């Protein structure tokens, strides 16, 4: 019958019995039956409250590692005495106090190759006494808040020869651990059977995961004088853990297992049967005059890619590899423009081919379409498709192989075309031969593909760039000084707010006059400065003052293009036309632009008017990729006099070219041709790439960022930027001055001015949840733990998720607090760089927490990645940084993950907030990054820091030493050296690293 007493109660009773024995001089008694008699007849009557039985008490002590128990003997470890004894201060060890740079590098290697240092050597090993749980090579000490636990690590020489303990290194930067060494001084000889004790006090007043490492350095057996003796190391990894109730519910559901090695195109066979493609819109009248090539990556590049990633090999051709590397490393110029950018696009596609395999499905059932009851369509559930992981759009295809035929010599592969996407389900058309034999529940092995259309139109744009000689626009050297308007023209503004903003007004006037041509005009718009407002006003003024002008207005995303349309239709309702791709879900299109886009509500489908009809509109609005349809229709090269690209810093340079090459001409002399306008911020996130090789060699640069970084026309001089070519907007209309302070200093030369509405920006300055009234930033320090589960490589941190949830309850709970404004969930955003943390936080607020899940509009609270919040703002932003472990930091740095060493991601995250910014993270780890270090110290100095104790000194150099050690592993201690840019656990087929699930493109 199970005991009615908890393990904690059993342990506490046993420790009190141990003290009872010591007080009576019976602490040396080990006879089990005599101890039972003392317990039942002497101890229990004096206990005062019901006590467990003797055997139950022993069980509790045994599982807590506080007693050694046999059928006849009991030996208590007597550790609890340490909890009440103050050891001499001279025996206390200050963690890290005597660690040299050499030893820091050694510790970094030990973090990486833990198993090697957990085993004893030469008969020397470590005995552990005290309450702990051994898990994955780590000693976990579970703590109740404000209750002390004591652990003893006894280094014992169980060998036959003497050894010498030369150094003892406890490594811990948190106050939850206190270390006391034994009586002996170091170096300390240990003969056979001798031991050296380390006593560890553990106590915490806050929840969290507090790691520590203990390293013993020893001199092995050798001749006298020890000249030939071997130095060896033994380590133990500790962690004190105190969970909040919510965090305990977020622990990994299944142990993390690395995904199996991926097999490329595993379902493709010699026999492929196709289904029916979705019907082309009956109203598709737009010409297709210019062919679009396939532009597949060259076979040789596929073969050489592993060598490019991993280094030379005897099985590769050095000459070809050297040629490719030379192309990659050469500075981008007009003479190598097409060759280099085409190569980078191929590298990106090869990475995409590899990454898409991550979503392949095995033994998944399909069913007949249950909703439309369409006998031609089958339904497949695809987890993650609603979040574009993977992206599946109407018109895309996938490959399926019957599970029952996978072992056949020549099975049939079925190519299914996507007709409809509904949340996590797709409806597919397959060949009639499959449909004729199909029954509900038939299972398949499925390979996903990605849409190559965006890549193909970028390759074509590179071809057209050279054909139309656009170098004066892409590598500008001067303006030709030709104005489109008289110098004395007066502007009547549509948006009167520009009257009080000289920078916006200046940019608009230069754009309309066109004096920058053939060079592009750049609107450099830091967060919240109104770059889209400026761009929209410029478009309206061009339409007004230049009657013959025709404008193409683009953005990389549908949301960006929709916003342009919404802003323009206010004053130009009959002059604009929004051209949408057929894959766009009409339910996602804002209602107010449906009347001026290519959706035919009567037919229930998209229409594509002929070129002649589209040319009648003064302004066409598309995404960059959809602009390729105008190129295919061969619009006259001089039709568009102006091309505007919003969010221009967020797209690859070849993507910008899709809307330029073939649609705009640059005259060799005289009239400089059309005006290109780029609006964006090079200090915020650039394009999302998958290939680290393409990223390293420049594909991550947008056209806007390249011009600002390398072209002299756009360089900042002693008097600022040249307003003829570029305007930097300076007035921030979004954030409280305190929130703006650090990013302003770090990225914008301190020039930004806080101009947000005072009432809006100060609505949380008196909130009682602030550590410091009037300072609307909170950094809540949490010593959490990085976790992973299942086969997902993405990280999550339960304690941070619980802390974020706690703040959300304070902000959104119906019972208002003093100083807190009424807040709707739609005005709150939660940002985390890891997909799994996003999922866990959503789970907390929609399932686990009773108060939050009960709110009617809780689904309006957006939880997403930094990329998903670019261009957006919320009254309140909460950020969960997730990372707490040194062990994986180098992985983040190598693959541009997380926040560390990623100033653009940091900048975007902290500048989304209007009135309140709450950051939850590990200050010890974030302090290794200079930008985060600046932010942390800013919060501390102004009273905005709370949570775990703030580190006395954020030692940036020490952190960098440890990180350096991780990336320079010694072959002598860690086995064969691995390629530095490819951590072993991330490698996939051909050495290609498996990225942590960035969202796939779903904008066409």
Curated annotation (Swiss-Prot):
Residues 966-1004 are annotated as: Disordered. GO terms for molecular function: 5'-3' RNA helicase activity; ATP binding; ATP hydrolysis activity; RNA binding. It is found in: Cytoplasm, P-body; Nucleus; Cytoplasm; Cytoplasm, Cytoplasmic ribonucleoprotein granule. Residues 922-966 are annotated as: Interaction with AGO2 and APOBEC3G. SUPFAM superfamilies: P-loop containing nucleoside triphosphate hydrolases (SSF52540). GO terms for cellular component: cytoplasmic ribonucleoprotein granule; cytoplasmic stress granule; cytosol; nucleus; P-body. The modification N6-acetyllysine is found at residue 148. A motif (DEAG box) lies at residues 646-649. One of its GO terms (biological process) is miRNA-mediated gene silencing by mRNA destabilization. The modification Phosphoserine is found at residues 433, 970. Belongs to the DNA2/NAM7 helicase family. SDE3 subfamily. 5' to 3' RNA helicase that is involved in a number of cellular roles ranging from mRNA metabolism and translation, modulation of viral infectivity, inhibition of retrotransposition, or regulation of synaptic transmission. Plays an important role in innate antiviral immunity by promoting type I interferon production. Mechanistically, specifically uses IKKepsilon/IKBKE as the mediator kinase for IRF3 activation. Contributes to UPF1 mRNA target degradation by translocation along 3' UTRs. Required for microRNA (miRNA)-mediated gene silencing by the RNA-induced silencing complex (RISC). Interacts with DICER1, AGO2, TARBP2, EIF6 and RPL7A (60S ribosome subunit); they form a large RNA-induced silencing complex (RISC). Interacts with APOBEC3G in an RNA-dependent manner. Interacts with TRIM71 (via NHL repeats) in an RNA-dependent manner. Interacts with both protein products of LIRE1, ORF1p and ORF2p. Interacts with TUT4 and, to a lesser extent, TUT7; the interactions are RNA-dependent. Interacts with AGO2, TNRC6B and UPF1; the interactions are direct and RNA-dependent. This is Putative helicase MOV-10.
């Amino acid at each position: 019958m199970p005991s009615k007493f908890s393990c904690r109660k059993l342990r506490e009773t046993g420790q009190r019995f141990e003290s009872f024995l010591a007080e009576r001089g019976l602490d040396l008694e080990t006879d089990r039956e005599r101890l039972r008699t003392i317990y039942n007849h002497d101890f229990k009557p004096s206990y005062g409250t019901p006590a467990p039985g003797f055997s139950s008490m022993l069980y509790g002590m045994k599982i807590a590692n506080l007693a050694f128990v046999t059928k006849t003997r009991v030996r208590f470890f007597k550790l609890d005495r340490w909890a009440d004894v103050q050891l001499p201060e001279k025996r206390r060890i200050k963690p890290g106090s005597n660690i040299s740079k050499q030893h820091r590098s050694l510790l970094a290697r030990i973090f990486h190759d833990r198993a090697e240092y957990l085993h004893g050597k030469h008969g020397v090993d470590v005995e552990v006494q005290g309450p702990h749980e051994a898990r994955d090579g780590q000693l976990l000490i579970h703590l109740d808040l404000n209750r002390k636990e004591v652990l003893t690590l006894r280094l014992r020489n169980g060998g036959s020869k003497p050894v010498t303990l030369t150094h003892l290194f406890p490594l811990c930067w948190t106050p939850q651990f206190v270390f006391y060494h034994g009586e002996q001084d170091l170096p300390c000889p240990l003969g056979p059977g001798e031991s050296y004790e380390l006593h560890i006090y553990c106590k915490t007043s806050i929840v969290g995961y507090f790691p520590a490492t203990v390293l013993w350095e020893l001199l092995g057996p050798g001749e006298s004088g020890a000249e030939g003796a071997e130095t060896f190391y033994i380590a133990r990894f500790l962690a004190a853990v105190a969970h909040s109730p919510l965090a305990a519910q977020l622990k990994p559901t299944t142990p993390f297992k690395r995904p199996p090695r991926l097999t490329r195109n595993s379902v493709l066979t010699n026999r492929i049967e196709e289904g029916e493609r979705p019907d082309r819109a009956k109203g598709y009248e737009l010409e297709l005059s210019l062919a679009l090539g396939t532009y597949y990556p060259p076979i040789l590049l596929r073969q050489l890619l592993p060598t490019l990633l991993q280094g030379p090999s005897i099985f590769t051709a050095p000459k070809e590899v050297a040629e490719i590397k030379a192309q990659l490393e050469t500075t981008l110029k007009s003479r190598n423009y097409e060759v280099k950018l085409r190569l980078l696009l191929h590298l990106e596609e090869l990475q995409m081919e590899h990454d898409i395999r991550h979503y392949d499905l095995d033994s998944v059932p399909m069913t007949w379409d249950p909703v439309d009851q369409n006998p031609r369509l089958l339904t497949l559930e695809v987890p993650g498709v609603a979040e574009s992981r993977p992206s599946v759009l109407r018109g895309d295809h996938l490959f399926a192989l019957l599970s029952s035929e996978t072992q056949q010599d020549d099975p049939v592969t079925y190519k299914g075309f996507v007709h409809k996407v509904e949340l996590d389900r797709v409806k597919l058309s397959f060949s009639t031969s499959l449909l004729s034999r199909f029954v509900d529940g038939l299972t398949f092995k499925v390979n996903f593909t990605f849409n190559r259309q965006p890549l193909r139109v970028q390759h074509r744009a590179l071809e057209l760039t050279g054909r139309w000689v656009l170098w004066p626009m892409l590598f500008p050297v001067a303006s030709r000084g030709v104005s489109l308007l008289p110098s004395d023209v007066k502007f009547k503004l549509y948006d009167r707010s520009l009257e009080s903003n000289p920078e916006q007004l200046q940019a608009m006037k230069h754009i309309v006059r066109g004096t920058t041509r053939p060079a592009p005009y750049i609107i450099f718009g830091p967060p919240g400065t109104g770059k889209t407002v400026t761009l929209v006003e410029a478009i309206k003024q061009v339409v007004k003052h230049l009657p013959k002008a025709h404008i193409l207005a683009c953005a990389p995303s549908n949301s960006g293009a929709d916003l342009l349309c919404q802003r323009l239709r206010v004053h130009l309702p009959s002059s604009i036309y929004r051209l949408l791709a057929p894959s766009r879900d009409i339910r996602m299109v804002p209602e107010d632009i449906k009347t001026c886009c290519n959706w035919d509500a009567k037919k229930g489908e998209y229409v594509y008017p002929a070129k002649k009809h589209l040319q009648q509109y003064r302004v066409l609005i598309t995404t960059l990729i959809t602009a390729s349809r105008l190129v295919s229709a061969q619009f006259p090269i001089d039709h568009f006099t102006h091309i505007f690209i919003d969010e221009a810093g967020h797209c690859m340079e070849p993507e910008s070219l899709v809307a330029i090459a073939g649609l705009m001409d640059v005259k060799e002399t005289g009239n400089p041709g059309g005006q290109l306008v780029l609006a964006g911020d090079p200090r915020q996130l650039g394009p999302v790439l998958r290939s680290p090789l393409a990223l390293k060699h420049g594909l991550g640069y947008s056209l806007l960022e390249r011009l600002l970084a390398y072209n002299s026309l756009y360089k900042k001089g002693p008097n600022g930027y040249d307003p003829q070519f570029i305007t930097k907007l300076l007035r921030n209309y979004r954030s409280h001055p305190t929130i703006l302070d650090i990013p302003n200093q770090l990225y914008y030369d301190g020039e930004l001015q806080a101009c947000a509405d005072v009432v809006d920006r100060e609505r949380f300055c008196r909130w009682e949840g602030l550590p410091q009234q009037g300072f609307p930033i909170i950094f809540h320090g949490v010593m959490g733990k990085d976790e992973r589960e299942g086969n997902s490589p993405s990280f999550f941190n339960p304690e941070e998720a619980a802390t974020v949830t706690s703040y959300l309850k304070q902000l959104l709970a119906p019972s208002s607090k003093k100083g807190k404004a009424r807040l709707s969930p739609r005005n709150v955003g939660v940002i985390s760089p890891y997909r799994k943390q996003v999922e866990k936080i959503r789970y907390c607020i929609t399932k686990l927490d009773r108060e939050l899940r009960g709110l009617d509009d809780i689904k309006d609270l957006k939880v997403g990645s930094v990329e998903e919040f670019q261009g957006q703002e919320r009254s309140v932003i909460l950020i969960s940084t997730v990372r707490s472990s040194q062990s994986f930091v180098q992985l983040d740095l190598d693959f541009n993950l997380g926040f560390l060493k990623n100033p653009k991601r940091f900048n975007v995250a902290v500048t989304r907030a209007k009135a309140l910014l709450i950051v939850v993270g590990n200050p010890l780890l974030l302090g290794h990054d200079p930008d985060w270090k600046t932010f942390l110290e800013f919060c501390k100095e102004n009273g905005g820091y709370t949570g775990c104790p703030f580190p006395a000194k954020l030692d940036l150099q020490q952190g960098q030493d440890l990180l350096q050690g991780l990336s320079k592993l010694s072959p002598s201690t860690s086995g064969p050296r691995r390629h530095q840019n490819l951590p072993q656990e991330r490698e996939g087929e051909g050495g290609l690293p498996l990225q942590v699930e960035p969202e796939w493109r779903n904008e066409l």
